[in-house]
Each structure stands twice: as C-alpha cells, then as structure tokens.
Amino acid sequence: MAKTIAYDEEARRGLERGLNSLADAVKVTLGPKGRNVVLEKKWGAPTITNDGVSIAKEIELEDPYEKIGAELVKEVAKKTDDVAGDGTTTATVLAQALVREGLRNVAAGANPLGLKRGIEKAVEKVTETLLKSAKEVETKEQIAATAGISAGDQSIGDLIAEAMDKVGNEGVITVEESNTFGLQLELTEGMRFDKGYISGYFVTDAERQEAVLEDPYILLVSSKVSTVKDLLPLLEKVIQSGKPLLIIAEDVEGEALSTLVVNKIRGTFKSVAVKAPGFGDRRKAMLQDMAILTGGQVISEEVGLSLETADVSLLGKARKVVVTKDETTIVEGAGDAEAIQGRVAQIRAEIENSDSDYDREKLQERLAKLAGGVAVIKAGAATEVELKERKHRIEDAVRNAKAAVEEGIVAGGGVALLQSAPSLEELSLTGDEATGANIVRVALSAPLKQIALNGGLEPGVVAEKVSNLPAGHGLNAATGEYEDLLAAGVADPVKVTRSALQNAASIAALFLTTEAVVADKPEKAAAPAGDPTGGMGGMDF
C-alpha cells in the first residue's frame, strides 16, 4: 500500500490535531459537573458514558496523521485504565496540556530531547511528592468517599465499601446486571466455583434443590472416575467414619456414579459428585487450590497416587459444603493457614508476571477464592442504556477503591497535582531541561482548570486561588466551596493520579521528539461502474 510522509512541524501539528479532537471529546466528562458523551453503536442502542477510555476507544479519525495522533492518546487512556482502573480523563487532559505547551517550545527553537529529559525528571519529582503526601486509607468511610467520587454516586461508594469490608482487600467484587431496580449486594463465604451436582438424585433439600453436606470428607481426583472397584476401598473407609463425601473429579460416570446414587437413595451413605471446574492446566491448578484450602491432596498419577491405594488421610475436610444445580460452595476448609498463605503469595507472583489480561483475571479470581471471598454487586436500571452506563461506573469505582487501599489517597479535584508543582523548585536544571520541567509545571494545573470550566467557573481564577491555599485545601466543585478536600471526602487514589501523569508524560515526550510521520495513503473511492449495456439505450425488446 502506498504511504504518505510528513516532516517537522507539519508532522507534529497533524498529530496534535488528532490528539485535540480526541481530548476535546473526553475532557467534557471531567469532574462532578462533567457531562456525558453518547457513543453510537453499529448494532443496538447507543451507549452513554462519562468514562474517558470508553470514549477514546470509539474515536476513529479520517485524516491519517490525525488518526495516529488520536491512537497515541488512546494508549495513554488505556494504560492508565489497565494500571489504576480510573483517571483516564485526567491522563488525557494532562497529555493534551503537555503536548500543547511542548510543541510551542519546539516551534520556538527548543531542543526536543532536552525537553524530554526535563519532562521525565519533573514527572519523577512530582510522583515522589505525591507518594510522600499520600494518606493511608484506614476507614470504611474513606473507601466509600473515594469510590463514591469515581462513580459520581455516594450510594455506590457506600456499597463498595461494604463489599470490601466483608471480603477483604484481596477479595473479588464482581458487578452483574439485575432485573430489579436499584443496587443489591450478595456475599459468598468460602470458595465457590461454577459446577453443580452431576445427578439430581444427590439433592438433600428438595425445596431449595440443594445438596448440603455437614462436616464432609472431600475427595479430589484429576481424572475420570468410572469403575466402582477403584472407588470401593476408599468408600468403605469413609462409610465407617460416618461422614458424608464430596467427590470433585474430571467426571464421575458409569457404575461409580450409579453406586453413589443408589447408596444415597437407600440412605446408606450420603455423597455428592461434582465435575472439577476449568480445563487443562487451569483445572489442575484449581484442584490444587482446593486441596490446600481443605487440607487434602489431589489424587493424580502425576504424583504417584491412585484411587485404589488412597487413604482417608489424603481427603480434604470442610465445615460445610453446599451444592446446587450450577455451583458448589466449600465453607471453612480445614487447610493449614500457612500453606494457604504460601499459595496466595505464589498466585500473586503469577499475577505480577502475567502479560495476558484474561490470565490475570482468572488468577485474580483464584486468589480471591483462597484469600477472601466473593461479593457480587447487582445493578438495575430503568433502561438497558442506563444499566450499561451504571454497571461501567460501578466497575470503575471498584478498581478505584482497590487502588486507594493499595497506595493511599491524596486530595482530589486536580488539587494534589497543582499543589505538587512547587516541589519542582528543588530540581537544579538548566537550558532546555529547565524548560521541560516548566512544561510539566504548566500542565499540572490543567485537570483543575478543566474541572472548574465544566463547573461553570473561571479556570484561571480558580487555579490561582488554589495554588495559594494550604496543602490539601482546594475547590470542591460539587458544592463550589473552597475547603479541606480530604476532610470533605474529595479524594483520589494516589495510584490513579501518578499513573495519569506518568502515562501522559510518556506519550507527550514521544510527540515532541517526532520528526517524521509515515502513514497509509487514503484510498480513493472506486469509480462507479459504467452502464453494463454499453450505453445502447433506446433499444426496444
């Protein structure tokens, strides 16, 4: 395909136009008085959102240079969303301010590489200042306030704080769509996985269609169980103990299944058979998680264990097991606390090293099942469009709350960034590096100015006033008051704020050092096909 090339100022200005097109659409959503953006979909109802990354992902520009500029800023929003789960609009606003100020200096003759070094040193200093000023999140109220700001709804913040209180900081909080109006919180104690009983004959509570086993033994097998002679020696030992048995295996079928069912119906022996969750290596890992949680061992030929020679000492234990048609919950496994912590640390290390979003999500679920629990927030709304928008806001707020617990919080509303600008005085830079640091100083006020603008206030006046207030005091855009923001519950996770600045600066530095852009030449539309009759009109058939 033919390419088109632009150089120098033309190249940089083309990229900047693309950046501005995207940033101008995103920045109207910033702050408590930010507006929404409607996104048209090829199929189905349009989406209404105030989430920066969702808007950025939808924008495709026609001009090849502008398209590349917009794609670079999308990267800022996506990276910030991946790392911190929020702050995508702030990152976009910062990137726009850094690029605008930087290109002005490049056009005036500054050396782009000198500016880049200055920007990097200034960002490092501001990040250090932000982390030093961060306050640890210690109370449920602080989590509720932070999540409430992210979602733009305090009731959502309260519910997320309640969920985190119940399942712990490592627990998983999932958001589901509900048919009923409003918000509900459901909590799961113990380990739950999405596999139910193999046969309906195992049910012990006919009304609720559940099989409930009190203080059972748990047999974990990595292969299929089909012949009864493999299972019989172990079954006899379990029957002698008088305890029920939960079997989790790749599958339980044939005479092994019918033997268990017949004994259950006759009342001789209570048991439930369940298929192991997952596939392949993930199934093996989840069985191992269950073994550690219940204090048992996975019976597998890989480790030299077989069903015929298995003993009761290889079985896991739990206080209670509840099995429904679709899921199994193991409550209070009898595993060793130290072994569980070791497994948790191992999974956490795998999460750090994983570069696949899907793998990371699955590992996170396994971690939650071992370390905490699972909370489900069910969100309902009047229309499908509102429901999607609400669900998205809650998911963002959950990640925001987790980021707050991880690294602490700073004053929100763009104030922490603006008030960290004086720390740049400590840098002893000269020439273009000093100019680069000054570009960052100017850009640090951009989020606050945009929040003020969206709230109908004069940006310059607000920024000037806030820069002269004590640390942590600033504009609460929701009320229009100047106050101690942390005390008023206006806080941002420092992880979100620093990620937004670091990612914006990274892309801005690339913009400034760009000297040529190579893009695909737009294809000309094909000429309309000619008259297939060759223009021989007037012939009468």
From Swiss-Prot:
ATP binds at T29, L30, G31, P32, D86, G87, T88, T89, T90, G413, N476, A477, A478, D492. It is an enzyme of class 5 (isomerase). Keywords: ATP-binding, Cell wall, Chaperone, Isomerase, Isopeptide bond, Nucleotide-binding, Secreted, Ubl conjugation. There is a cross-link at K132 (Isoglutamyl lysine isopeptide (Lys-Gln) (interchain with Q-Cter in protein Pup)). Its EC number is 5.6.1.7. GO terms for cellular component: capsule; cell surface; cytoplasm; extracellular region. It is found in: Secreted, Capsule; Cell surface; Secreted, Cell wall. It catalyses: ATP + H2O + a folded polypeptide = ADP + phosphate + an unfolded polypeptide. GO terms for biological process: protein refolding. The keyword Ion transport does not apply. InterPro entries: Chaperonin_Cpn60_CS, Cpn60/GroEL, Cpn60/GroEL/TCP-1, GroEL-like_apical_dom_sf, GROEL-like_equatorial_sf, TCP-1-like_intermed_sf. Its main location: secreted. The keyword S-adenosyl-L-methionine does not apply. GO terms for molecular function: ATP binding; ATP-dependent protein folding chaperone; isomerase activity; unfolded protein binding. Pfam families: Cpn60_TCP1. Together with its co-chaperonin GroES, plays an essential role in assisting protein folding. The GroEL-GroES system forms a nano-cage that allows encapsulation of the non-native substrate proteins and provides a physical environment optimized to promote and accelerate protein folding. Belongs to the chaperonin (HSP60) family. Forms a cylinder of 14 subunits composed of two heptameric rings stacked back-to-back. Interacts with the co-chaperonin GroES. This is Chaperonin GroEL 2. It comes from Mycolicibacterium smegmatis (strain ATCC 700084 / mc(2)155). The gene is groEL2.
